[in-house]
Amino acid sequence: MKRILSKLSKETRCYILSALMIFDGFEELDYTTEIRGEMHLDILDLTKSDVENFAIPSYAQIVAHIKSISDYELRDWIITNTYSPVLKSRRNDALQTFLKFCSDLGWDVNEIKDTMKTTEELWDLKPMNYNFRNVPANNDATSGCFSTIAIFFICIAIITIALQ
């Protein structure tokens, strides 16, 4: 995966990191939070300096930038790494935000469902009830996403402190 990601621009990798951190924000902060952040930086081949110099994007900017990714393996990796924290949190607002995110990306629904099923099996967790046709069109799901952006900032701060 690192080889595929290394072909992307640093900007695109920063947008992917932003998406991952939003969904990581649904999990409780614990001793693994810092480790997950460091793993994200490593696989995305980003440094503390890269993250500090990247302007914090809005949800719309994240979606607009990631939407154009066409590599199936990379899409699968993004869905797996955004869905697994949602599964672990067992929070309905997290699931609604994830479904809204998937809907906004406009990627193949069957591809997303297959990846979700694989992720559920990987983490040996029961699936949460989801229905792509009933994704809310209002801002309720998005507001949950925006509230997690604050957690994104906290995670970046933790990573920054840890890497100093």
Question: What is the role of each PLM region?
Answer:
Residues 1-163:
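Small-residue-enriched hydrophobic alpha-helices in membranes
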